[in-house]
Amino acid sequence: MMVCFMAAVMMMSVGCHKESISPIIPDSPIIPDGALPGLFSVSATQRVYFSQGNLQYQASTNTWRFAEHQYDYVGTQTADGYGYYGGNVSGSDNRSISSTYSGWIDLFGWGTGSNPTLSSSNQEDYGTFVDWGSNPISNGGNTSNRWRTLTQAEWDYLLNTRTDASSKRGTGNINGVGGLIILPDSWTLPSECSFTSGFCSPSGYTYPDWTHNSYTLAQWAQMEAAGAVFLPAAGGRNGTNVYHVGRYGNYWSSTPDDESYAAYFMYFSSYNLSAVGYGSRYCGSSVRPVQDN
């Protein structure tokens, strides 16, 4: 069996620690439909809004939407070989991916904006990138070409290069759902919340460990209103096999690796992060669109 995600280079693992973040007066822009309020630098000259949740697709109605909440993901209800399964979108399972499926899916092969239910394991079927954001997204303005996917360089800039990058990212959980938290450029911590940057190394067999930051739904509502982004660890898909749900997060970039028919993605677990991982294009990963400011 081929391994979907072949490498995750430039890994960074940081022990549990706290870093203070100086409050900055937030921006007051007009927030696009379907977007979160924070602005995030993805290059020296470009800032973006993140969508309100991961991208989802319903084949039976040809409908695209953003997840209702940032912590929502489809996942699967069938355990993988490691015993991992999960998801909180009722009546939906990524294992059921097909052109007629009436549930929702949210793990897509690379560049499948024009063919979101493609589940072939033939690399050549994924040769041309079509951005998922080129489609009308029902709760994201519902017109074409409003949204796009970050490039590999933009993921890297966001997570590693922008001002205070390392102090504005960390793992955690929202009401038990694990994932990666990213803070906006201008950030004021809500008075009833806390945030600890970085990651926790696994201890013994306690893996994954998403307790680095823990939020109730009420606490997360305050964090989100202040601009925080949460990317759930929604796992991956190979054909109709879904794996590592709740253990890893894999988020596509729009950047191909033409020499190997792979593509770049942003990868994280509860204890590390890579902005420049790469893997086979046929492997299903999460998509979190952005809109340019």
Question: Whereabouts are the PLM-identified features?
Answer:
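Intrinsic disorder/low-complexity segments enriched in polar/small residues
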Residues: 3, 19-20, 69-71
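Bacterial N-terminal signal peptides
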Residues: 3-13
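Bacterial Sec-dependent N-terminal signal peptides
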Residues: 12-39, 289, 293
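Intrinsically disordered, low-complexity segments enriched in proline/serine/threonine
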Residues: 25-28, 118, 186, 192
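C-terminal, surface-exposed recognition/capping segments
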Residues: 35-37, 44, 48, 52-59, ...
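A short glycine-rich, aromatic-capped structural motif
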Residues: 37-126, 149, 153-159
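Short, motif-level signal for alpha-helix interfacial/capping segments enriched in acidic residues
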Residues: 126-133
